[in-house]
């Protein structure tokens, strides 16, 4: 994906957020004082595994038959700031292990290659609630702080510089998904399924974009104070 398309996609998401947020705030104002359901704010702990892969661009489409996903740890925290009973803003910070595998005898090399990246990721999502079900989407940024490349049985650390075979530390993308909440007294348990689409070419000398599917379990505790809520109790 070129820079113009990336910029257009991000701009469209920002406009969508602004329009949705404005409409929901207006709707919340109209319903205030009418006994509306209060906005819900939660702090979550989450831990699970993520299945990630790499996209090598249109110029290397022949590699699609040789790609295999890799599993990695995904753990961190999430904060859902309720705006109204139907809309929340969600920010997260977590560690994730990304990467992908190319089987042997592929068009690039005769050897099996596994790339792994260790990153901290920060998504900011718009979440729409439909009872216990929700949908969310938004941009994310990640910082790749280390990584390894394993060729056959030999593993070596990758470099983050402008040299050949180097990688970029910063990565940006978009996430979209849905979830279901299971109330447990004043707490809740949530199952979240999300697709992650990388927009940044993380390689210095070829096309390489992150892709991932995250299925996570969130252990939630209510957060009593939320300055963003439209229908705060007094």
Model-derived regions: residue spans:
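Outer-membrane beta-barrel "beta-signal"
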Residues: 182, 209-234
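Residues that define the transmembrane beta-barrel architecture of outer-membrane proteins
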Residues: 39-41, 69-73, 116-120, 131, ...
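Glycine- and aromatic-enriched membrane insertion/assembly motifs of diderm outer-membrane
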Residues: 44, 62-110, 120
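Outer-membrane beta-barrel channels and translocator barrels
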Residues: 38, 82-86, 130-133, 183-185, ...
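Short glycine/proline- and aromatic-enriched beta-strand/turn motifs that initiate or cap beta-hairpins
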Residues: 21-78
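Flexible, solvent-exposed loop segments that connect beta-strands
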Residues: 54-67, 98-118, 145-170, 203-205, ...
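Residues on the lipid-exposed face of transmembrane beta-strands in outer-membrane beta-barrel proteins
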Residues: 45-49, 73-83, 93-95, 122-128, ...
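Cleavable N-terminal export/targeting peptides
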Residues: 1-39, 222-234
């Amino acid at each position: 994906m070129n820079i113009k398309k990336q910029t257009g996609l991000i701009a469209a998401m920002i406009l969508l957020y602004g329009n949705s947020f404005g409409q929901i705030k207006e709707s919340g104002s109209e319903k205030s004082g009418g006994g509306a359901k209060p906005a819900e704010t939660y702090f979550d702990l989450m831990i699970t595994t993520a299945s990630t892969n790499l996209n090598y661009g249109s110029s290397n489409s022949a590699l699609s038959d040789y790609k295999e996903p890799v599993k990695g740890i995904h753990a961190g925290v999430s904060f859902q700031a309720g705006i109204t009973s139907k809309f929340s803003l969600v920010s997260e910070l977590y560690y994730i292990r990304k990467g992908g595998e190319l089987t042997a005898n592929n068009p690039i090399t005769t050897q099996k290659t596994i790339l792994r990246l260790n990153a901290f990721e920060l998504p900011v999502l718009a979440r729409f609630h439909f009872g216990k079900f929700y949908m969310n989407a938004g941009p994310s940024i990640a910082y790749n702080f280390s990584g390894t490349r394993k060729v056959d049985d030999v593993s070596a650390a990758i470099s983050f510089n402008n040299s050949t075979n180097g990688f970029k530390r910063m990565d940006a993308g978009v996430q979209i998904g849905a979830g279901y909440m299971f109330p447990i007294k004043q707490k809740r348990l949530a199952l979240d399924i999300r697709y992650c689409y990388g927009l940044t070419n993380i390689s210095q000398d070829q096309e390489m974009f992150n892709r991932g599917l995250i299925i996570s379990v969130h252990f939630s505790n209510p957060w009593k104070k939320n300055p963003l809520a439209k229908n705060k109790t007094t």
